[in-house]
Curated annotation (Swiss-Prot):
Name recorded for this polypeptide: Lysozyme C
Native species: Dictyostelium discoideum (Social amoeba)
Catalytic reactions of this protein: Hydrolysis of (1->4)-beta-linkages between N-acetylmuramic acid and N-acetyl-D-glucosamine residues in a peptidoglycan and between N-acetyl-D-glucosamine residues in chitodextrins
One BP term from GO: defense response to Gram-positive bacterium
Keywords: Antibiotic, Antimicrobial, Bacteriolytic enzyme, Cytoplasmic vesicle, Disulfide bond, Glycosidase, Hydrolase, Signal
Gene name per UniProt: alyC
Amino acid sequence: MRIAFFLLILSIIVGLAYGYSCPKPCYGNMCCSTSPDHKYYLTDFCGSTSACGPKPSCSGKLYFTADSQRFGCGKHLNLCRGKKCVKAKVYDAGPAEWVEKDAGKMIIDASPTICHELTGGSSCGWSDKFEITATVTSLTDSRPLGPFNVTEEEMDQLFIDHEIAMAQCEAEKTCNGFDLE
């Protein structure tokens, strides 16, 4: 009995130490799950090939993200840190599940421009632990890609719009790895 109790406690400690585990792995090395609390760490990337067509240029002020396996290619996301937000377009897949496991949290991989807009820094790595909120935009959202600020009420509306947009893409099987089933 004591050994079983000890093993239970040990497994809880190990689980807490490693924290994050992807609820829905996909494509062999990525996570298709979205964060239930909409919280992610922000990382930046540039110069890779794109899972969604032509790769975006790394020069200029471009607002793009990876995470197509979660949200779908071409979807628009609102990425917010506090009341500062950026509307971006999903252009690529990623990051790898092992990166999120090492970070201990789901990650939104975004353009260097988004990193700068939301943090003021020149780069964002998972170890920086820049926490952001990510929501899918409403289909009727006419806001252009780029930075904007929100009030508390507007932030609440972003969450409502996200739930509606995710329900639509799940029904269409264009997000959360539904195309794998």
